[in-house]
């Protein structure tokens, strides 16, 4: 297997060749992955917002954004600037500390979760042995922020919206975790790198989506509910309880909720690609293709091509899933709160438990195919 390109080693060696001490070179490298991660996630959100507006406009036979830049590509930037310069209003009877902390608790864990998303063999900020467990743990913090925002607003509609959001997130967190546990059982690891490696070698035929068809459906439904996407956007739907926990928010605090929702959608799509679609792996194994062409897997230019294709494949898979999520917005009607909770507790939870037990049985019966 191609070991991948070592960006950290190449960067530090380049700085050492320029005369910098090794310690200084490492200090310069340390913040760069985090900065790239924040910039990449922000740009990804801007692209998703623009795509959703254009796709939604096409579904309604409209033009969509077209004046802010060519084809309206700068419309999300204009929206962000508008929110930045709006007045930040705090209700007179609200708790100012909790009111401010709520949006931060919603957004910050999502950005931190990008630490474990791999775009290649060595293209990951932190390859933890419990990477997927860390993602699930961080996603469990968001309901606290939502409930805090609803409570701190001192508004009955905000409080009810916050309670609904917390109940929805908790209801779908358990089926999500159980579907991920089935993947971890097959991969014998919670590391995102190991999960992708377990799917490599056979191209598209080795992806987990074929061995976990029920698990991938559970994961995708639960991920949409976690991101509060239609048809699961009850906590913030205008037709429901005013605007939910966001009712009293304005300016950049409201913008944090807006950004957090889309950043979480992109993150969920990337994690889905890692768990079920082979991550950065190409549908045809590149190592086998290089062997057929007589190219050495250790050649530098092949490593660069492999890394570039890996990043491209991850983004293509993620944005295809986001495209599906946007289409669902204009296809599936919004469910009622009782239907939403029944789906999570009475259907997805027992099905995810059965799927986990079935995966364990298949692993014992067919260890080669199911990672015994």
From Swiss-Prot:
Intracellular or extracellular location(s): Cellular thylakoid membrane
> Does the record bear DNA repair in its keywords?
no
Q: Does the keyword Cell cycle apply?
A: no
List the molecular function annotations (GO) for this entry: NADH dehydrogenase activity; oxidoreductase activity, acting on NAD(P)H, quinone or similar compound as acceptor; quinone binding
Annotated membrane-spanning segments are 31-51, 97-117, 130-150, 176-196, 204-224, 254-274, 308-328, 347-367
Q: Keywords on this record?
A: Membrane, NAD, NADP, Plastoquinone, Quinone, Thylakoid, Translocase, Transmembrane, Transmembrane helix
Name the chemical reaction catalysed here. Answer: a plastoquinone + NADH + (n+1) H(+)(in) = a plastoquinol + NAD(+) + n H(+)(out); a plastoquinone + NADPH + (n+1) H(+)(in) = a plastoquinol + NADP(+) + n H(+)(out)
Protein EC: 7.1.1.-
Q: What is its main location?
A: membrane
Q: How does it sit in the membrane?
A: Multi-pass membrane protein
The main enzyme category here is translocase
In the record, biological process GO terms are: aerobic respiration; photosynthesis, light reaction
Note the InterPro entries from the entry.
Answer: NADH_UbQ_OxRdtase_su1/FPO (IPR001694), NADH_UbQ_OxRdtase_su1_CS (IPR018086)
- PROSITE patterns reported for this sequence: COMPLEX1_ND1_1, COMPLEX1_ND1_2
Task: Name a single GO cellular component.
Answer: plasma membrane-derived thylakoid membrane
Assembly with partners or alone: NDH-1 is composed of at least 11 different subunits.
Can you tell me which family this protein belongs to?
Belongs to the complex I subunit 1 family.
The function of this protein is:
NDH-1 shuttles electrons from an unknown electron donor, via FMN and iron-sulfur (Fe-S) centers, to quinones in the respiratory and/or the photosynthetic chain. The immediate electron acceptor for the enzyme in this species is believed to be plastoquinone. Couples the redox reaction to proton translocation, and thus conserves the redox energy in a proton gradient.
Recorded hits in PANTHER family, A to Z, give:
NADH DEHYDROGENASE SUBUNIT 1, NADH-UBIQUINONE OXIDOREDUCTASE CHAIN 1
Record-given protein name:
NAD(P)H-quinone oxidoreductase subunit 1
This chain's source organism reads Gloeothece citriformis (strain PCC 7424)
